[in-house]
């Protein structure tokens, strides 16, 4: 893996090519170049948490230290400096010091065996999204996926940092999309510190998968609209019908928590207090009652806010720009500060009667959709990204799943018509069925080496007749997105 090229792809020419002083590769006749931006790098997670790092202003300095750093800031700052005379503690990595946004990144954190995922799971979800990651890095507890922009977004204070606000909304929407099916850390800084690419941690890299900010913006609009957000307010009510938010379990869980600090940052206190205030507002309580209870809550905190900050948060909640606390955001807060094991059932009250299914073994009829789940799981278990299909017989499938013969034939026909699976049947004594899911085929094509891709696609196309299928369409779509010739004036755009 050409790590210097990976680094340069992410940084988008945001740093000088050579060190300003003591360069070992710049020729004598080449001028150092005008000053650009700076990034921060750290040699271990412990150093990163403690703020002990180095300021880097050139690509040469990064390459000199290849594989010695563990973390960095992939988005470029205007300047970087040190907070102490020994030049050990870095200073300057704040949002109002951002120079250019190069990439969005997602942190996939695996805490339990149940949450275990692979890079292939990330790529599979990305296929549904329609935007592929440029880079996937393996970390100690999971993965980080980079979505590098086609051209960087430049940040200006004149626009009141609207580009940062716009990019934050897109970044949050990307995280929430992946968070529906994968263990995503929804609380980490959008443009902060990430894992740095090294020879020992890059799982996937394809520089062709870079998209314009406009494309991300258009997608983000749709995501925001689908959530029911209004453009003027990003927080929307989302309580249980017929139930006051202050009477729901999540409210008491947050109200009686006191330790809102640590690695996640002190911003947790503000977010929690604002959310609790919204719950009081949506439940019909007066602003005076809310203020009194928030003062009581604040006094119990290990690190309380100033009184004027409490009043500001309560008044903001009662400004009528919001109707209630957002259900998704409530879940994020409770998982971050109370317990990561909490589920929706633990947090929200659901009213009404529900008819529960009998166990499948106790039912005479099984829905085709259930057999579909079993078959897709069977295909996934028996194949992998390097051999995305399995060769077997219908008899073996029937015995493995316990599915009737006619049902299997019908299921194969339906799934093939929907292009969810592809198969080829060979008749005769040594015959059988060659079977693959559409996603596993597409994923294997994406991950195969560039020099082998053409012949590999040709072989799969001949085996499974892939011409004029969604696989061919998706590959074209991912590889041939329209390019933008000019830098966007992002600061006049509404990002939804």
Swiss-Prot record:
Span of the signal peptide: none
Give the intrachain disulfide bonds: none
Which GO terms fall under biological process for this protein? Answer: DNA replication
Question: Where's DNA bound on this chain?
Answer: 120-141
Q: Provide the GO MF annotations for this entry.
A: DNA binding
Q: Which UniProt keywords apply?
A: DNA replication, DNA-binding, Plasmid
Q: Which InterPro entries has this protein been placed in?
A: PriCT_1
Q: Kindly name one Pfam family recorded for this protein.
A: PriCT_1
| Task performed by this protein | Essential for replication.
What is this protein's record name? Answer: Protein RepS
State the gene name recorded for this protein. repS
């Amino acid at each position: 893996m050409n790590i210097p090229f990976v680094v340069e792809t992410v940084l988008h020419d945001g740093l000088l090519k050579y060190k300003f002083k003591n360069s070992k590769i710049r020729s004598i006749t080449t001028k150092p170049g005008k000053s650009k931006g700076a990034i921060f790098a750290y040699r271990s997670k412990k150093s990163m948490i403690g703020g002990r790092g180095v300021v880097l202003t050139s690509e040469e300095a990064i390459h000199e230290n290849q594989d010695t750093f563990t973390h960095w800031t992939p988005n470029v700052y205007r300047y970087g400096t040190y907070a102490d005379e020994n030049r050990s503690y870095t200073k300057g990595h704040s949002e109002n010091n951002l120079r250019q946004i190069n990439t969005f990144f997602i942190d996939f954190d695996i805490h339990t065996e149940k949450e275990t995922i692979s890079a292939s799971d990330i790529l599979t979800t990305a296929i549904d999204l329609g935007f592929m990651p440029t880079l996937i890095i393996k970390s100690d507890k999971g993965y980080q996926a980079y979505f590098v922009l086609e051209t960087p977004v430049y940040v200006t204070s004149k626009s009141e940092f609207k580009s940062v606000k716009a990019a934050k909304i897109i970044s949050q929407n990307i995280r929430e999309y992946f968070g529906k099916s994968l263990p995503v850390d929804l609380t980490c800084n959008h443009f902060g510190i990430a894992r740095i690419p090294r020879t020992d941690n890059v799982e996937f890299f394809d520089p062709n998968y870079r998209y314009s900010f406009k494309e991300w913006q258009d997608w983000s609009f749709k995501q925001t609209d689908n959530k029911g957000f209004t453009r003027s307010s990003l927080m929307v009510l989302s309580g249980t019908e017929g139930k006051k938010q202050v009477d729901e379990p999540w409210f008491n869980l947050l109200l009686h928590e006191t330790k809102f600090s640590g690695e996640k940052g002190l911003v947790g206190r503000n977010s929690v207090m604002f959310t609790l205030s919204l719950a009081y507002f949506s439940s019909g309580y007066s602003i005076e009652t809310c203020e009194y209870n928030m003062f009581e809550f604040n006094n119990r905190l290990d690190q309380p806010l100033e009184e004027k900050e409490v009043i500001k948060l309560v008044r903001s909640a009662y400004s009528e720009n919001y109707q209630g606390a957002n259900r998704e955001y409530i879940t994020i807060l409770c998982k971050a500060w109370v317990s990561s094991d909490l589920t929706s059932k633990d947090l929200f009250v659901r009213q009404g009667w529900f008819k529960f299914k009998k166990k499948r073994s106790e039912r005479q009829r099984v829905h085709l959709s259930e057999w579909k789940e079993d078959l897709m799981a069977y295909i996934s278990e028996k194949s992998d990204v390097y051999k995305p299909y399995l060769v077997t017989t219908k008899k073996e499938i029937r015995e493995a799943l316990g599915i009737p013969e006619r049902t299997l034939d019908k299921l194969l026909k339906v799934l093939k018509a929907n292009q969810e699976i592809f198969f080829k049947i060979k008749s005769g004594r040594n015959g059988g069925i060659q079977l693959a899911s559409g996603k596993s085929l597409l994923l294997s094509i994406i991950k195969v080496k560039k020099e082998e891709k053409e012949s590999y696609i040709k072989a799969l196309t001949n085996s499974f007749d892939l011409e004029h299928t969604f696989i061919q369409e998706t590959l074209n779509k991912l590889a041939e997105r329209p390019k933008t010739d000019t830098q966007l004036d992002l600061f006049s755009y509404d990002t939804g």
